[in-house]
Amino acid sequence: NGNASYNLKSNGVSIHTNASTSSYTFTQSNITSNQNYELEVLQGTTTITKKFSVIVNPGANTQAMPTNLVDGINYNSTDATKATLVLDAPLKDFVYVAGSFNNWQPTNAHAMLKDPTTGKFWLELTGLTSGSNYTYQYWVVDATPIAGTPAMVKTADPYSTLVLSPYDDPTIPAASYPNLPVYPTGQEREVTVLQTGQTPYAWSTATTNFVKPAK
């Protein structure tokens, strides 16, 4: 209770302040891109921060998906700077890909396209560095959700080969998983690890020359 100082930030930039008020309101209009807000409330020596986001519908994003793509990560065999993501999310309205490659602030450039035939969402990532680890997750939006369910769900790729978890990873000893990639600070829920230009696994001759024993 009582007066407090308010500082509202949008994508890390302060857009409105009020040095002393007991009830804070602010209206921002003409929002055309995704915004991550932080409201810092200072009262005496106590600071409370509230976070929330506004996700903009990118509109019609229909485009035929290239052939021979499968659900999950599709690595480009001839260009290690590219990878194509495919997500099957029936009845969802739109999907953004948020990741380390866009500082977890996806714009229209990372709004997934929707294949008109299969209804699957897909997006080609470009500008990747071969051998580097990237993390990402899908922001799946239902514009008219069922009562009691969220309009947006953040989820790792269901076909991930490596997932980082803010809940489980701290309990994994280095002896069990050496050099486990670090979960990205400030994110929510599980994320997928993507790496182009991986060195193919060297199978032993015992495996490649295995002969099935007779019954």
List each language-model region with its residue ranges:
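Exposed beta-strand face motif in extracellular beta-rich ectodomains
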Residues: 33-37, 132-136
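Solvent-exposed segments in extracellular or luminal domains encompassing
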Residues: 20-36
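An acidic, Gly/Ser/Thr/Pro-rich helix-cap/linker signature
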Residues: 57-80, 135-215
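Conserved structural position at the C-terminal beta-strand
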Residues: 41-43, 140
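Solvent-exposed loop segments of extracellular immunoglobulin-like
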Residues: 2-6
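Aromatic-rich carbohydrate-binding modules that target alpha-glucans
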Residues: 20, 79, 84-131, 141-179
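Conserved aromatic beta-strand anchor motif in extracellular beta-sandwich/beta-rich domains
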Residues: 8-12, 97-99
